[in-house]
Amino acid sequence: MLKEKTSDVSMTNTNQGSGTAAEAAVPMSHGLWNTWRKNLLLFCLTGVYVELCLHLCVFGSMDRYAGYPVLFGLLGGALCTLVVSSLPKVLRQITGVFLVAAQVLLAEVQLVYHCIFGDFMPVSQIGMGGNVVVNFNSQLLYGIRQNLLKILLLLLPLIVVILCLALRRGQALKLRLRWKQTMASFAVLLALLLTVTGLMYVGRDNAFSVYRTFTNVNTSTDSSYKKIGMLATTAQELRYMLFSGSGSIMITPSSLNMSDVPRTYSSNSYNVIESIDFTALADSTDSDILKATDEYLSNATPTRKNNYTGLLKDYNLITICAESFCPWFISEELTPTLYKLSHTGILFENYYGTFQSVTTNGEYTMCMGLYPDMSRTKTDSSFNVAGTNYLPFCLGNALKGMGYQAWGYHDYIGDFYNRNITHANMGYTFKAADSGLAMKIDWPSSDLEMMEASVDDYINSGEPFHAYYMTFSGHYQYNWDNAMSAKNRDAVKDLPYSEPVKAYIACNLELEYALEYLMQRLEEAGVADKTCIVLTNDHYPYGLTEDEYNELAGQTLDTTFEKYRNSFICYVPGLSENIVVDEYCSTADILPTLLNLFGVDYDSRLLAGTDVLSSGLHVAVLSDKSFLTKAFRYDAGKETVIPADENTTVSGKLAEAYRLYVDSRFQLSGNILNSDYYAHVFARESSGGSLADTVVFTDIKSIFNQASVLYMYRKGYVEPEAPDTFGGKATARLGEFVDVLYRIAGRPETDNTALPADYENEEFNAAHPYYNAVCWAYQTRLLRQNDPNTEYDDKVDYQTACVLIRRYAIMAGVDTGVDQTQLRQLLRDAPDLGREAAKAMLWCDEKDITTRDSSLDELLASAGTRISRYQMTSFLFYLCTYELDIGS
């Protein structure tokens, strides 16, 4: 007897005959295939819509690369269809909505991030998200408000998918039909994949082709988003991060700066360290990345020493990386100090800031003379990776070796971007607004207050000094909510500009006032005539729109090159006449130029930048690897060569040689960073070139949480729960809280006479690790018998933490007064809160000890919420640095 072929659809109606059921199965099966086709169309259109919408929202128009985001959007849609086709009914609908929601959410995040920072966020920086929310929450809300319509447009496909999938009445499919639909989805995906691969492969030989963009590990996130879109970029970054281990290490040489065979150079004529033998170094290592770098540098040509070598060897040096600085607001009337600095000394007429956004990239390049790692394999910012590397050429370390004091300052929190680690490693005694500088933290903070709080550290020391400043007053947003813009509003009220441009100028006036104060103090100390001041920007002021920036500049600037034109101010008093330099240069060239001017022994082959005052090759390099020379400009985005004038002819061979040279600068920088190359060259013990070496505890993942924990741990104030685990998520206990305060106090002698009766027992006695701390706490009345929490094992909430912190501050002689009007209002609004607790929470909020960029109402609402060990550590870290001034 033959077995009948079963239907792909479960049939449950037993009132119909077998013939009727068989007839019904066919149209029902067709209907289910129609549903599959609709799903395929829905997911593919969603992928295309999200890609095109994001592209248009960010770039403003379509270009010749827009077709590839469309194709990858189709691929993403086919992949979604493949995933949901293999799932049962309910799970199929839930998964479909989830996949689209994830796609839309990523696009929304990138849109807002681009609005705030001017570029796209790499997957490797997703861990910074929490820090952005905490430290940039007002900017985050501003970005959302500015892009609300675009955000709603990006939400449309999610709404459509929810309506089409979640509200659609699905039918159960037998495994056989699910398998067929899965195979059909796979076939569509494969066809699209072959099509896209074929199209990319056709143009693979072009240096900046879509194929190279997609496959090259060193492709930047911005370039990738523009050429291949969000989905493909995210997929590639995830693939390299999760499965690829390391990126490219080979450096392709250019004929412009390489000799055919290794040569020996004399330090009398060249900026080299003669003891370095790159060939011998290559033979001494088994590391592929070290060997590749050694072999490349063995043929590299160094820069020549020149008439300016050692010109400033008797000078002090102050370097300033100025937040969002540009030269267009400088005038003799409005900014006389900046005007004087920019017109006296060495004048660089063709300087370009390399970066569109991200302070840490510009700051890193200025300080290191190297480009940051912008490849897909990076897992952290380059500054953080360099935080454990050997860095002999950073100005702090280099000048300290010549007898200079070296100080570093920033007028925001010190653990942001881990500056308390990275800048100390560059040789600076580092202070920030929350760690060592007596100044107010604001958004943004005052450059003038930073200067006032720091100058006395070095100006009257009688020793040569180098001071480095990372400013903050020029940070966006440019409106009257900006603290520095509001402060200086009257000074710009009559200027003929729009409000954002006025606000930009107003907040940058704080830098002018800081420099005015600095010059005054230098004069008073009698060292003004022997102090060189260098200033440049970290990045383009992305907080201004293109039209607003043109308004400020008084001209229409092209967005590929001229918007990056900026200032490398090198103020040198005492020269008989200004030195005018017309060579093209950019951020990475500042360090080698200063090393040469100050007569530092360095090897120019070990830096990506070039001494601008030397003879030879000079290029202004931008972050997307576009560049400018005297003869021509190269637009990497469009892959076009633009001659300097109509009489200049640029051969393809010459353009390619320059392109390879620029590419080699980035690859060399990445190799030096990721291998701790200087440690290899100078036979120092290598740290491995990873921030992981500085992370003591595996459960403290965020680089922005590490600083407070490591600070408190290294000071001996807190103990981890295990050698490699801090235990930050565990609930804080009263005994440990007072023990940390006891350690901060210096572990004074104490006894048990103040302990409440019956407090000691079998579990808590003189052998207990918190015994002395609890005895001390009761003896000093830090703990009191009528407190809500008195037992050493009690869990600590926000209210208790605030009370203990304020009590300790009073013991330490800190002014803990609060506004009485605000206190009375608080007691009326929160009648259940005791007077002491109200004072404590109000004071802790005002001093930003327990809250950061959040309101008092939020703190009060959390009064009874228990805090974690990490929160305890963070609060007490801010007590130490904000109020007790215990240096970092």
Language model: regions and residue ranges:
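Intrinsically disordered, low-complexity repeat and linker tracts
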Residues: 1, 7-25, 250-300, 678-717, ...
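Transmembrane and membrane-interface helices of multi-pass
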Residues: 2-4, 21, 25-268
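Generic recognition of well-ordered alpha-helical segments
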Residues: 104, 131, 589, 593-597, ...
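Membrane/wall-proximal cationic-aromatic binding patches
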Residues: 217-319, 324-339
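Solvent-exposed soluble domains appended to multi-pass membrane proteins
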Residues: 286-694
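Sec-exported extracytoplasmic/periplasmic mature domains
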Residues: 342-346, 371-372, 400-404, 459-460, ...
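Feature responds to low-complexity, polar/acidic, surface-exposed segments characteristic
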Residues: 687-706, 715, 719-738, 742-771, ...
